[in-house]
UniProtKB/Swiss-Prot annotation:
Pathway: Cofactor biosynthesis; (R)-pantothenate biosynthesis; (R)-pantoate from 3-methyl-2-oxobutanoate: step 2/2. It catalyses: (R)-pantoate + NADP(+) = 2-dehydropantoate + NADPH + H(+). One of its GO terms (biological process) is pantothenate biosynthetic process. This is 2-dehydropantoate 2-reductase. The lineage of its organism: Bacteria, Pseudomonadati, Pseudomonadota, Gammaproteobacteria, Enterobacterales. The gene is panE. It comes from Yersinia pestis. Catalyzes the NADPH-dependent reduction of ketopantoate into pantoic acid. It is found in: Cytoplasm.
């Protein structure tokens, strides 16, 4: 399969390495055009992948059957919009990022958009990407358009298992959003690993109650209890992980909070609902972000 991976960070390099090893015709795409990208990944089994892979080849992009978007949520709109005229109409676009709300920012177009939520974890250590935790990737459309692309799910599963197809991914996206609304701001606020947020059970319950109330208004059957159970399971299973938002704060990068808690607050506002706990955490993270962005020269640009 001919694939372009947009964004060559930790997750992008992980997918590039895995797809290349399955003999797919894959390239990366960088914001600043370069002829190749040095992909250095240490796999879960300790083996290393070190290759210079092609990047930013417009002919490859035009012929691509899949654009796999591995950017931060706030980078997606401008980057994908710039590439839309350069893609063939049959090219599917799979968005793999934390949070929700990016597709609404894109111009109307004819492409099939798919969303993915993943529990794979990778981190950067210098010039090397370390695959620190295997996981599950769920993909599918968020619209009511009937698409059945188990073949794509199977292709991706062969490269980086497990991958499952959903005819409507929306519920899975909201579940992941609930987890992110708890783990990301709390780890960012308290500068701790995922497991350490278990010290704040009452706060976690209040956050889950607010998320559940919005999900109910959005048409998803859930409860505070079921959401709390799910979130706590994820906290325990990822206890040693450092959240992406905390990594961003420590590196003084722009975070994805506007597409995590920010998205939740926007949906709540549309239903006339107030979410005091989530709103408080959102403001605290934005304050941390603005402290260093005011000193720096605007948003970091590399992806």
């Amino acid at each position: 399969m001919k694939i372009t991976v947009l964004g060559c960070g930790a997750l992008g390099q992980l997918w590039l390495s895995m797809l290349h090893q399955q003999d797919h015709d894959v390239q990366g795409w960088l914001r600043v055009p370069q002829p190749f990208c040095s992909v250095n990944v240490i796999m879960l089994n300790g083996e290393s992948f070190n290759r210079n892979l092609t990047t930013n080849d417009p002919k490859h992009l035009l012929q691509s059957e899949l654009l796999l978007v591995c950017l931060k949520a706030w980078q997606v709109s401008s980057a994908v919009t710039a590439l839309l005229p350069k893609l063939n109409p049959e090219c599917k676009i799979l968005l793999l990022h934390n949070g929700m709300g990016t597709q609404e920012e894109l111009p109307l177009n004819e492409h099939v958009f798919l969303h993915g939520v993943t529990t794979h974890a990778a981190r950067r250590d210098g010039n090397t990407i370390i695959h620190v935790a295997s996981g599950m990737t769920h993909i599918g459309p968020t619209s009511s358009v009937i698409i059945d692309d188990n073949h794509l799910a199977d292709t991706l599963h062969q490269a980086l298992p497990d991958v499952a197809w959903h005819n409507d991914i929306s519920a899975a996206c909201w579940q992941k959003l609930a987890v992110n609304c708890v783990i990301n701001p709390l780890t960012g606020l308290y500068n701790c690993r995922n497991g350490d947020v278990q010290r704040y059970p009452e706060l976690i319950e209040r956050l889950c109650a607010e998320v559940a109330s919005v999900m109910e208004m959005e048409g998803y059957h859930t409860s505070t209890e079921s959401l709390l159970s799910y979130v706590n399971n994820v906290i325990r299973s990822t206890a040693d992980n450092t959240s992406s938002l905390l990594q961003d704060l420590r590196s003084q990068r722009h975070t994805e909070i506007d597409y995590i808690t920010g998205y939740l607050l926007r949906r709540a506002r549309s239903h006339g609902m107030a979410l005091p706990e989530n709103a408080r955490l959102y403001e605290l993270i934005k304050r941390k972000e603005s402290d260093y962005e005011r000193i720096g020269a605007g948003l970091p640009g590399s992806w």
